[in-house]
């Protein structure tokens, strides 16, 4: 980055703006992504992101905001499970929370019916209610596993 670019970011107080944006995010990963944002200079990319923002705002106005409050970081747990490692009850409950969130967000999207530039993101979501329920029925709390598990 050039000195002029960095000076412009300071003058615009981008770090303060991004901190305010991060305060609105529901997950730690979301907060981190907000703080890491940088201005774009590609007109097509800017146009697409503006269209996505408009579409998301329209959905929120019509239906309210989808809930992401259950999202906890699970990437490390999934990587360990993929390598054959064992997961703790806490990790399994977090994964169940992510699966529940995916199911709820997919249902949120399905209610709309209007095509938007966000469709590609919603279509990538794959709920797995069977696994979600298997986890929640088997793990009673962070320290208690059901006898039938």
PLM regions with names:
Residues 1-148:
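Conserved amphipathic alpha-helical "coupling/scaffold" segments
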């Amino acid at each position: 980055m050039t000195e002029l670019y960095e000076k412009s970011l300071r003058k615009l107080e981008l770090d303060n703006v991004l901190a305010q944006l991060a305060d609105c995010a529901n997950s730690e990963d979301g907060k981190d992504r907000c703080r890491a944002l940088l201005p774009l200079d590609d007109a097509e990319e800017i146009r697409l992101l503006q269209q996505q923002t408009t579409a998301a705002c329209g959905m929120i106005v019509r239906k309210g905001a989808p809930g992401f409050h259950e999202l906890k970081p699970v990437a490390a747990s999934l990587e360990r499970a993929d390598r054959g490692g064992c997961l703790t009850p806490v990790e399994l409950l977090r994964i169940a929370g992510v699966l529940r969130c995916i199911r709820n967000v997919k249902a949120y999207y399905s209610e709309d019916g209007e095509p938007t530039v966000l469709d590609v993101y919603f279509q990538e979501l794959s709920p797995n209610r069977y696994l979600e329920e298997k986890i929640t029925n088997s793990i009673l709390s962070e320290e208690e596993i059901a006898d039938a598990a």
